């Protein structure tokens, strides 16, 4: 080999080694501080103005008397620690300023390779014998002298001679000189169940032996799986995980030339150990749903085999028209039978590859969600203002807060402020005349209020919605700058709808639309949101752009995280999303007006829908499209739908050409021009077929639920 190829090889190797982060040797405990309770134990001084946590790790790593460090996120300070959480007299505390990093060798409960680097605190052999202290020569004499470098502390199991069986110790039994401690390798310690989505082991190398890249770093490979966005995926340190529903756990590697690889982990097999039998995967698969789906639909096992746009699904065991990795044999526990809608990768809802070459995959949003509501425990008349029963739990089973209590929520309505409302104990009541029935504040700190486990009495018919009011005045909403009068989604054209938002999942992908009804509130469809109770960490709304995939740094783009979701009244199919901060209103981002309560849009009114959804080949769906539609009466709509259209729904005229809402548009607005303003009269929900010619499109009528919308925005 000549000197030039050798030089190039050395440069390449040095680059590969240079991509390894010193943080790879540490376990991270976010928002945690480690204190030693002894006054005589003093940590190292704070070293301020450190570049980042990697610099702290670089300082701590080679020091034998540094086993952990604090990193102050605010001051970028670093404090080296001579102890870990397993040291005597130490205790972990929550911290709003610090992250704790501890050397893996000191806190791992398993060993890598033969455990020469193991520095844990196991002090008993596999046979149950206590270990002899390394500093003692009785009852068993030996040649080892404890030093800071060899780590022969106390009577902890160690492997100073590289025994292939792993750490061992001399015993306190004269007849048994030494014995293995039986500490499992990290590979053996935890097996993989199903495809390993719930794997939480501590293996940090791939099957080829490459070291894994930390999930919280973006070098050498940038990626979307940021731990703070994927809290449920346990993306700790650089351990093998499966956040995207791959065939088995994997990781990004520290080799710049190899982005990601699978990890070599044992399968649990058919005879599951007791510790695995209660895993999340198996609990999630109990009571598989056939006619509806829960959460994200990972347990859905029904036979729906078309998308919400009516496109037939491709068989999972076929690779045409679309090639894919979800081969049924490799995903045995995902039930990838025939061409049924499934969710093998933890997407937002059940989906499938489609039989249309130009459309790779689509959701099956037409599958209903399983009801989460309790069987009603009583009934009420009218709107329930006179209800004086003793039901004291919400429709989801959450206990009500006492009306006189201020914990966990400070109530607007109390026995003192509303003496005629019967606000006794924590019984469900309706002090504000809510048209959707009795409600209560809840004992859940994250749920301010909800409607109760009650239903309208059978002999009580709800009043019909009112006629349109004579005078309607709107201010500071529903205004836009139209560059063209030709604003005409399927069959639509690129248009301007500054209140239409794009909902983005944790990987930044568009999956639904929504409408900006207040600076910090977005209205969307229940079918788009997988949970109204669990945090939607990592989900965002994007505003101010007509591009589905805007370029980084696009001037008018606003990206705002979703703080929480509030589910609408029963049958509404609505969800309000509260944003972490208010958006900035301008020509590109505007509020849409809400209609008056119970407002009925006159037949013939021209409205428009907007979205980035599937256009079934009629146009380019990478930009926002707007399509015009005329409202028809519910009576006319029911002639097509055989009387199934309710007053809480609104219809638009079916056209000969396919114009309507499709995959990706759901949750977006049906906006009608009323009194010189654009008003949110309807919300796009999944229909039986996408943009079916000559069939009316159905929307949720927003005016029926506008009192709930205003109530949530006021109370929250």
UniProtKB/Swiss-Prot annotation:
Signal peptide: 1-18
Principal location: secreted
KW Ion transport (keyword) present: no
Tissue: Liver. Lower levels in lung, placenta and adrenal.
Subcellular localization, as worded in the UniProt entry: Secreted
Domain (PAN): residue spans on this chain: 19-105
A GO molecular-function annotation: receptor tyrosine kinase binding
Cross-referenced InterPro entries: HGF/MST1, Kringle, Kringle-like, Kringle_CS, Kringle_sf, MSP_HGFL, Pan_app, Peptidase_S1_PA
GO biological process annotation, one example: negative regulation of epithelial cell apoptotic process
Subunit structure: Dimer of an alpha chain and a beta chain linked by a disulfide bond. Interacts (via beta chain) with MST1R (via SEMA domain).
Protein family (similarity comment): Belongs to the peptidase S1 family. Plasminogen subfamily.
Protein name: Hepatocyte growth factor-like protein
Annotated organism of origin: Mus musculus
């Amino acid at each position: 080999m000549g000197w030039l190829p050798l030089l190039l090889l050395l440069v390449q190797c040095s680059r590969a080694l240079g991509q390894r982060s010193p943080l790879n040797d540490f376990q991270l405990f976010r928002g945690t501080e480690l204190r030693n309770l002894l006054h005589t134990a003093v940590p190292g001084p704070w070293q301020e103005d450190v570049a980042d946590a990697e610099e702290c790790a670089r300082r701590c790593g080679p020091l034998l008397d540094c086993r952990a460090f604090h990193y102050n996120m605010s001051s970028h300070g670093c404090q080296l620690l001579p102890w870990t959480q397993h040291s005597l007299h130490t205790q972990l505390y929550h911290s709003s300023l610090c992250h704790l990093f501890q050397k893996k060798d000191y806190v791992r409960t398993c060993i890598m390779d033969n455990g020469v680097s193991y520095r844990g605190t196991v002090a008993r052999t596999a046979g149950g014998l206590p270990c002899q202290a390394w500093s003692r020569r009785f009852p068993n004499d030996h040649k080892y002298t404890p030093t800071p470098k060899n780590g022969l502390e106390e009577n902890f199991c160690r492997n100073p001679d590289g025994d292939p069986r792993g750490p061992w110790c001399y015993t306190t039994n004269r007849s048994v000189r030494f014995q293995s401690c039986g500490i499992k390798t990290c590979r053996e310690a935890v097996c993989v169940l199903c495809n390993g989505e719930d794997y939480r082991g501590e293996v940090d190398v791939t099957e080829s032996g490459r070291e894994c890249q930390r999930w919280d770093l973006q070098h050498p490979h940038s990626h979307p799986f940021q731990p703070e966005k994927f809290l449920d995926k346990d993306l700790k340190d650089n351990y093998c995980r499966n956040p995207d529903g791959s065939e088995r756990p994997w990781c990004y590697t520290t080799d710049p030339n190899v982005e990601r690889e699978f990890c070599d982990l044992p399968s649990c097999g058919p005879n599951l150990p007791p510790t695995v039998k209660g895993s999340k995967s198996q609990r999630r698969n109990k009571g598989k749903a056939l006619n509806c789906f829960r959460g994200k639909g990972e347990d859905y096992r029904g036979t729906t085999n078309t998308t919400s746009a009516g496109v037939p699904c491709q068989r999972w065991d076929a690779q045409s028209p679309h090639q894919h990795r979800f081969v049924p044999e490799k995903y045995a526990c995902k039930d990838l039978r025939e061409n049924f809608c499934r969710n093998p990768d933890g997407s937002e809802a059940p989906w499938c590859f489609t039989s249309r070459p130009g459309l790779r995959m689509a959701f099956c949003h037409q599958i209903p969600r399983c009801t989460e509501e309790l069987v009603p425990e009583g009934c009420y008349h009218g709107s329930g203002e006179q209800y004086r029963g003793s039901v004291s739990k919400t429709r989801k089973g959450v206990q009500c807060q006492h009306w006189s209590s201020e914990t966990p929520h400070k109530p607007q309505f109390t026995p003192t402020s509303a003496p005629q409302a019967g606000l006794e104990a924590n019984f469900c009541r309706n002090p504000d005349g809510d048209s959707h029935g009795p409600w209560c504040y809840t004992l859940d700190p994250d749920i301010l209020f909800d409607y109760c486990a009650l239903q309208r009495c059978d002999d009580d018919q709800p009043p019909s919605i009112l006629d349109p009011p004579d005078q309607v005045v709107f201010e500071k909403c529903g205004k836009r700058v139209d560059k063209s009068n030709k604003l005409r989604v399927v069959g639509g054209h690129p248009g301007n709808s500054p209140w239409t938002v794009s909902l983005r999942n944790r990987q930044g992908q568009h999956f639904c639309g929504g409408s900006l009804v207040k600076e910090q509130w977005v209205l969307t469809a229940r079918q788009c949101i997988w949970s109204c109770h669990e945090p939607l960490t990592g989900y965002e709304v994007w505003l101010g752009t007509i591009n589905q995939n805007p370029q980084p740094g696009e001037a008018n783009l606003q990206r705002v995280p979703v703080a929480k979701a509030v589910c609408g009244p029963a049958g509404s199919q609505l969800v309000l999303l509260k944003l972490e901060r208010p958006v900035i209103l301008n020509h590109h981002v505007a509020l849409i007006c809400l209609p008056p309560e119970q407002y009925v849009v006159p037949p013939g009114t021209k409205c428009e829908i907007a979205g980035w959804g599937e256009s079934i080949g009629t146009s380019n769906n990478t930009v926002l499209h707007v399509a015009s539609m005329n409202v028809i009466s519910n009576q006319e709509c029911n002639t097509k739908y055989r009387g199934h259209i309710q007053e809480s729904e609104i219809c638009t005229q079916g056209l000969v050409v396919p114009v309507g809402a499709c995959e990706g548009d759901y949750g977006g607005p049906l906006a009608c021009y009323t009194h010189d303003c654009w008003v949110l009269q309807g919300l796009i929900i999944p229909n039986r077929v996408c943009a079916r010619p000559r069939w009316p499109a159905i929307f949720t009528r927003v005016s029926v639920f506008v009192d709930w919308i205003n109530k949530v925005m006021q109370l929250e």
